[in-house]
Regions:
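Gly/Ser/Thr-rich phosphate-binding loop
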Residues: 16-18, 30-116, 129, 220
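Residue-level signal for inorganic ion chemistry
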Residues: 17-20, 77, 130, 184, ...
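Short Gly/Pro-enriched turn/cap motifs at secondary-structure boundaries
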Residues: 119-124, 169
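Conserved ATP-binding/catalytic segment of the ANL
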Residues: 131, 138-198, 215
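Adenylate-forming
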Residues: 151, 185-214, 241-251, 268-273
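C-terminal boundary motif of the adenylate-forming
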Residues: 177, 215-239, 264
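Conserved C-terminal "lid"/linker of ANL adenylate-forming enzymes
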Residues: 221, 229, 261-299
Length: 299
């Protein structure tokens, strides 16, 4: 028997919680980070004996924010910010990141939090097979393919779309790019249709740039687009925090320029961002809370 409750973008199944990344990230950024990023807490977290106790306390507080009594939090539906994930892993929070698609009803990859590898989305789920369409799956990203009894038979009355999605050997083509390590852990790079090409043909994954940018000061969310041979980052600022700091339009623009410069020290030269443009409204999203990227590529 499965008992579940649905609230917003979280769902509880038995004693686990399923959530989209946006919900987790907002809780951590708004409720947790401000409490641990002062000088005193930073000092305590660098003292080995005390650090363990402090992290246990932080983990308890984060767990209580989700009700306290659960086996694990399963995160999926969109890319998970690496800064937030690294924090959750460092304090021992019981989470895992899964991967799936409606066409697979919906689970493709999953791993119990006890064996989960940070940065991955788990391994092929029970009865599923997953492979990377690449000559070197561990190092060269390729399309993620899935096969198993839960893969759909096809799209209703759309044979052409079905043939484009499921090949003659029964492999479902996800449209996502990723790698797989020797233990079968899958690491998603981004959507194949989102991939950009650098000036010399390098593959650029905008989701990876956005993940780093979203961890910088006053950035609520972002979309990286290509204009000619330049990469432009559209940023929706954290206006609440900016107001708390009493920052005006000019100061906010200065912060974003500083962010751009810092970002470019964190990424390869061929994927450097030339400009950050402030986007006043929140980006439109799908029901899974993924940004509708196609709406902003023409800006």
């Amino acid at each position: 028997e499965i008992s579940c409750s649905l609230v917003g973008s979280e769902m509880c199944i038995r004693d686990s919680i399923i959530s989209v990344p946006l919900v987790i990230e907002k809780i951590i950024r708004k409720k947790v980070f401000p409490k641990i990023q002062n000088n005193r807490m930073r000092m305590l977290l660098h003292m080995p004996v005390i650090s363990k106790k402090v992290k246990e306390k932080i983990c308890d507080q984060v767990s209580n924010a989700f009700g306290g009594n659960f086996y694990e939090v399963i995160i999926g539906g969109a890319a998970f910010n690496q800064e937030v994930e690294s924090f959750l892993h460092s304090v021992g929070f019981k989470y895992t990141v899964g991967y799936g698609a409606t066409e697979c009803a919906p689970i493709i990859c999953y791993e119990d939090y006890k064996n989960f590898v940070p940065g991955s989305c788990g391994k092929a789920a029970l009865h599923m097979m997953v492979r990377i369409d690449s000559p070197d799956p561990e190092n060269v990203p390729g399309e993620i393919l899935a096969k198993g009894p839960n893969v759909m038979l096809g799209y209703y009355k759309n044979e052409e779309a079905t043939k484009q999605t499921i090949d003659e050997n029964g492999w479902y083509h996800t449209g996502d790019l990723g790698t797989m390590d020797g233990d079968g852990n899958v690491f998603i790079k981004g959507r194949s249709k989102n991939m950009l090409l650098g000036a010399n043909g390098q593959n650029i994954y905008p989701e990876e740039i956005e993940d780093k940018l979203n961890s910088l000061a006053l950035v609520a969310e972002s979309v990286v687009v290509q204009k000619g041979d330049k990469l432009i980052a559209l940023v929706h600022p954290d206006y609440d925090e900016a107001q708390t700091l009493n920052l005006g339009t000019n100061e906010l623009a200065d912060v974003m320029e500083q962010n751009r410069q810092e970002l470019n020290t964190m990424i390869p030269a061929y994927s450097k961002v030339s400009e950050i443009r402030i986007h006043e409204d929140e980006f439109e999203k799908t029901p899974k809370k993924s940004i509708k990227r196609f709406l902003y590529t023409a800006e």
